[in-house]
Amino acid sequence: MTDGCRPCVFIWAVLLLLPSVIMAYRPVIIVHGLLDGPAQFKVLTNFINESHPGTSVTTIALYDYTASVKPMWQQVEGFKEAISPIMESAVDGVHLICFSQGGLICRGVLATVPHHNVRSLIFLSSPLAGQYGDSSYFKHFFPIFIKSRLYHFCYTSFGQKISICNYWNDPHQRERYLKNSVFLAPLNGEVNHDNSTEWRNHFMHIEKLVLIGGPDDGVITPWQSSMFGFYDDDETVIDMEYQDYYASDAFGLKTLNSEGAVEKCVVSGVQHTHWHSDYSVYQKCIEKWLT
């Protein structure tokens, strides 16, 4: 081989290695929201494959559409069973994108899986601190109720069998919420329970927590719930950093934030059902965290 050909051989060797480099992205798992299913996430899947070629993207087909109103802990167990094999087969870990109600399902999954390997946990407009508002979803399920009266139904044993009621957080009925919430209150460490330390340790295994939301969402109420903020009893929004569960570091949020692991991405002009198909949202808030 002549000296003049050696650079050519080197270049070809590098080019042959490129496909394996390109396909080295971690798998992405998508968890849908209320009244959603995998079909709603085809655009997002395309965004991921265009920017990160070769990425394995799985949208979990479970509790789709009307089945999404099943109790949250029931859904958590089902999604856990579906997600665990994907995590186990991914030596370098996975990324998790969770939309709307799916964000709370993902929180439940990660709190109760001892050795998960989620690297980036991306919450896409999720009611992380709860929901309290007359959105179109609310009126679809509870047409005869107004938000100020829904606690009469949600804070009962029967109401707690419906997903929306599992994270209904009435700021004017704090005692009833803490007493009757079987999902959100224990998950956010707002009530004492035997698993609180264990759940906290599991959740803190993540490397990056990305919170995405915006003021024009129209469904998540208040929209700051997507940033772990929520109303006080005067319906004034109290930001994440001033919430009791943050101050007490009940589930590790304060620690993650102090370590620089929490990223907030606020985008105006995006309606709730458009978050996962808005390319600017993908570019600004999601793409960089999927390596």
What kind of region is each of these model predictions?
Residues R26-V28, H32, V57, W73-K179, ...:
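Serine-dependent carboxylesterase/thioesterase catalytic core
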